[in-house]
Amino acid sequence: MISIVLELFQNLCCCRGFSDATIRVNDKRYRIQRLLGEGGMSFVYLVQLSKNSLIIDNGIATPELYALKKIICPSVESISNGMREIENYKRFQSPYVIKSIDSQVMQEKDGSKTIYIVLPYYSLGSLQDSINRRLLEGTFVSEAECVRIMLGVTRGLLCLHDPASRQDNATSRVNVDAVSMTYSDETAMLLEDTPLEMDMLSSNSAGSIAYAHRDITPSNILFSSDGLPVIGDLGSCSQADITIENRHQLSELQEWVNDNCTLPYTPPELLNLKLNQVLSSKVDIWSLGCTFYTLMFGISPFEREEQIHGASLTYAINTGKYSFPRNSRFSEGLLSVIKKCIQVDPIQRPTTSQLLNLLQDLDT
């Protein structure tokens, strides 16, 4: 109860502090309601279209709510990462993957850049929010609901992992890009000397590349108004297949993992990077298995192992040491799917298509 009161107080303070603050993105102005979250050099705000920008529906002004992500980019590398994130929000045309509504790159007076990305606001919250509510209420998720959520998230991942699954959307993607590439006039000038990745600028090549999210967690699974699970926060998403060819690349990737991956859901191959190592989209299958486990039991598998046996989290992950609670209410078939995902050897994990088939068999 005390924590709920504190959260309410903080929200009221946030709302009061931002009551007159607005952010302009292209031709629309958004009034900040409160801070939703922050991390590193990025902030996410709950915003509302200002009066002059309200959407008119049947003659009625609709006060639309959005999530607005602000990314501060002090370096060439950070602007490159930010631009990749912008492209990610337009790349995957699936109801199970988040899409942006608008975006803009702004030049600041000190020479740095700031990226603004307008995203849908998911009022139903995240999968982690749902798990937390059940823990507080002492209720449990049914197997049928588990499978429904798992199927949706896996379908979203299939869109990232499998270029063939995006072919049906190739035509619509061109139209979406034509509309949504509405950056400010100065954007081209800002990015003249930025070493952007080639796949960011070529829709043709992007359609043939497999991508990995690399930070699938319950907090990054959102629920749409009709209850569909939606993969969110594509800031960590990039080309799936990577070969570590030199020590500089190894060092940079290690730093990236530390900054972008959530440890309880991070696969062992990302914690033990080596020269000549090949990384693939199978990193997401491990994270997905851990996320499914958390949905079912309210705690991630390796954090549970740490609590029960005192093993370090990293050691438990590297050895794949975890267990299921005794007398589980879930079927052996569903537990078997989790076991297949949480395999230390990536080769032993199913592909996204194989995982989808396993879940569909449970759904029949």
UniProtKB/Swiss-Prot annotation:
**Alphabetic keyword roster:** ATP-binding, Kinase, Lipoprotein, Membrane, Nucleotide-binding, Palmitate, Serine/threonine-protein kinase, Transferase, Vacuole
S-palmitoyl cysteine lipidation: where?
A: C13, C14, C15
**Which protein are we looking at?**
Serine/threonine-protein kinase ENV7
Topology relative to the membrane: Peripheral membrane protein
One Pfam family of this chain? Pkinase
Q: What does this protein do?
A: Serine/threonine-protein kinase involved in vacuolar processing and morphology.
Reaction catalysis annotation: L-seryl-[protein] + ATP = O-phospho-L-seryl-[protein] + ADP + H(+); L-threonyl-[protein] + ATP = O-phospho-L-threonyl-[protein] + ADP + H(+)
Its EC number(s): 2.7.11.1
What molecular functions are annotated in GO for this chain? ATP binding; protein serine kinase activity; protein serine/threonine kinase activity
Q: Which PANTHER family match?
A: SERINE/THREONINE-PROTEIN KINASE 16, SERINE_THREONINE-PROTEIN KINASE 16
Family note: Belongs to the protein kinase superfamily. Ser/Thr protein kinase family.
Which CDD domains did the record assign?
STKc_16 (cd13986)
**One GO BP:** vacuolar protein processing
Recorded GO CC terms: cytoplasm; fungal-type vacuole membrane; Golgi apparatus
Source organism per entry reads Saccharomyces cerevisiae (strain ATCC 204508 / S288c) (Baker's yeast)
Q: What happens when the gene is disrupted?
A: Leads to internal accumulation of precursor CPY.
Active site annotation, chain numbering: D215 (proton acceptor)
The answer to whether keyword Glycosyltransferase applies is no
Could you tell me which residue ranges the Protein kinase domain spans? 30-364
Gene3D superfamilies from the UniProt entry = Transferase(Phosphotransferase) domain 1
Annotated residues that bind ATP are located at L36, G37, E38, G39, G40, M41, S42, F43, V44, K69
- Localisation: Vacuole membrane
Q: Which top-level enzyme class is recorded in the Swiss-Prot or TrEMBL entry?
A: transferase
